Amino acid sequence: MKTILQIEDNFANRRLVERVLEPFAYRLLHASDGQSGIDTALQESPDLILLDMGLPDMDGQTLVSILRETPALAKVPIVALTAWPESIAGEMAIRYGCDGCITKPINVAEFGRQIEAYLAR
């Protein structure tokens, strides 16, 4: 079973991702801030990290840098979940070190397929 860590401070967004991914039988973990996201990632070794780029304690760029500089986590795919405009979201996510980007509000019909594609890499 694949493990996904969602680092997201907004409860409604966490619940939405949980509901959308439920049929896929992933093990879904949650962290509500950057530091607990790092701690959870180190303890659980997720197969994918879904990262809100606007966390209250740490900006997304800083968090991605920390994850990438941590040997045990450096190769874990990171997908930004962001409210940035779609026209710049992908470019900004890649510039910050993410493997990809999904814009909010998420397209429920596409989200599961997108996650499966990132996990298949």
Regions found by a protein language model. Give the residues of each.
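Two-component/phosphorelay signaling modules centered on CheY-like receiver
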Residues: 11-29, 96
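The feature encodes the CheY-like receiver
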Residues: 56, 74, 86
